[in-house]
């Protein structure tokens, strides 16, 4: 499972170097797509297959489910690391996530996240200053 956060830069062509601890995680290819809170999710192909199975199980008759699937799938792009361990992030995804210059590459269960540093700081601060739901804490420390 990938963990940690690494500050990097995204070049003018939309390429970001994958931090060394994360390279093996995505060496067989990856899917980049829109994530929550304005970041990008980066799934290794094996994890993406599990995500697809979960999304396919959502009810087609539910408007919220359809909207979420549309949001998630329409932004998805397949990618591989180049010979300099960079991943190319499409312009539409860079615009969505506000990635221009500095970027935070963060680990999460089953995926990586690419963040605009300002949004990353806001997201981390929000967690620090908002008590988690009691159910979440009970499961976390159990």
Swiss-Prot record:
Self-association state and partner proteins as the record states: Forms oligomers.
GO BP term, pick one: negative regulation of DNA-templated transcription initiation
Subcellular location, principal: cytoplasm
Alphabetized UniProt keyword annotations: Cytoplasm, DNA-binding, Repeat, Transcription, Transcription regulation
Lineage: Bacteria, Thermotogati, Deinococcota, Deinococci, Deinococcales
Protein's cellular compartments: Cytoplasm, Nucleoid
Single annotated GO MF: DNA-binding transcription factor activity
Family: Belongs to the MraZ family.
Domain SpoVT-AbrB: 5-47, 76-119
Protein name listed in UniProt: Transcriptional regulator MraZ
Keyword RNA-binding found: no
GO CC annotation terms, alphabetical: cytoplasm; nucleoid
PROSITE patterns to which the protein is assigned, alphabetical: SPOVT_ABRB
Keyword DNA damage carried by entry: no
């Amino acid at each position: 499972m990938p963990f940690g956060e690494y500050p990097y830069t995204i070049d003018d062509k939309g390429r970001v170097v994958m931090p060394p601890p994360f390279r093996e995680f995505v060496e067989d290819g990856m899917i980049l797509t829109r994530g929550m809170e304005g970041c990008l999710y980066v799934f290794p192909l094996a994890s993406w297959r599990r995500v697809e199975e979960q999304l396919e199980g959502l009810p087609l008759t539910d408007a919220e489910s359809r909207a979420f699937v549309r949001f998630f799938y329409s932004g998805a792009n397949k990618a591989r690391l180049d010979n300099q361990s960079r991943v190319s992030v499409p312009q539409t995804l860079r615009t969505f996530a506000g990635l221009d210059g500095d970027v935070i590459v963060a680990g999460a269960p089953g995926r990586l996240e690419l963040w605009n540093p300002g949004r990353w700081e806001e997201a981390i601060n929000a967690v620090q200053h908002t008590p988690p739901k009691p159910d979440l804490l009970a499961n976390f420390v159990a």
